[in-house]
UniProtKB/Swiss-Prot annotation:
GO molecular function, one term: proton-transporting ATP synthase activity, rotational mechanism
Predominant localisation class: membrane
Record carries keyword Signal: no
Membrane topology reported for the UniProt record: Peripheral membrane protein
Ranges in coiled-coil conformation: none
Species of origin: Desulfitobacterium hafniense (strain Y51)
Gene: atpH
Alphabetized NCBIfam families for the sequence: ATP_synt_delta, PRK05758.2-2, PRK05758.2-4
Subunit structure and binding partners: F-type ATPases have 2 components, F(1) - the catalytic core - and F(0) - the membrane proton channel. F(1) has five subunits: alpha(3), beta(3), gamma(1), delta(1), epsilon(1). F(0) has three main subunits: a(1), b(2) and c(10-14). The alpha and beta chains form an alternating ring which encloses part of the gamma chain. F(1) is attached to F(0) by a central stalk formed by the gamma and epsilon chains, while a peripheral stalk is formed by the delta and b chains.
Protein name as annotated: ATP synthase subunit delta
């Protein structure tokens, strides 16, 4: 089975449970868990090392996160370990966050520009994206000087490229085919 499909199934199961219990709390704990694993090499070593037994992994993870994570998230982590799916944790967390955003009617827009946008430009862009999508928009901004000017926006798999660099590329292509 593909990694994405496995992560989707586990994320969906946890999401359905979280909706019944406490979506915001479980999402925050899952992100905290991922952050801890990413930032702490010892925790990552224990979680991912193939020669540490499953029971040792579960015991150590339960001790490390006893006061930090709810029983629901600790049980979910134990399930991943039991089924040898802990390597999917990061992807599961990413899919879970996407499901939570969908439930809250939030869409993420990645906005790249050559220079930082002014507050007025950000507000106008935010309003226009909300109007276009019919959803609440969370903008993730990135400054990329190589774009020369303009803005590139990505929402899901849709890209709107209004950058000077893109327009120059199109001019080059049309001149080379002329």
């Amino acid at each position: 089975m593909l990694k994405g499909a496995i992560a989707q199934r586990y994320a969906q199961a946890l999401f359905e449970l979280a909706v019944q219990e406490n979506l915001d709390g479980i999402e925050a704990e899952l992100q905290e868990l991922v952050q801890c694993v990413e930032q702490n090499a010892e925790v990552a070593h224990v979680l991912y090392h193939p020669h540490i037994s499953l029971s040792e992994k579960k015991d150590l993870m339960n001790k490390i996160f006893a006061g930090e994570l709810s029983v629901t998230v600790r049980n979910f982590l134990n399930l991943l370990i039991d089924r040898r799916r802990q390597n999917y944790l990061m992807e599961i967390a990413r899919v879970f966050a996407h499901l939570a955003d969908e439930a809250r009617n939030i869409v993420e827009a990645k906005v790249a520009s050559a220079i930082p946008l002014s507050e007025t430009q950000e507000q106008r862009l935010h309003q226009e994206l909300a109007r276009m999508t019919g959803k609440n928009v969370r903008m993730v901004k990135e400054v990329r000087p190589e774009l020369i000017g303009g803005v590139m926006i990505q929402i899901g798999d849709r890209v709107m490229d209004g950058t000077v660099a893109f327009k120059l590329q199109r001019i080059r292509q049309s001149l080379s085919h002329a």
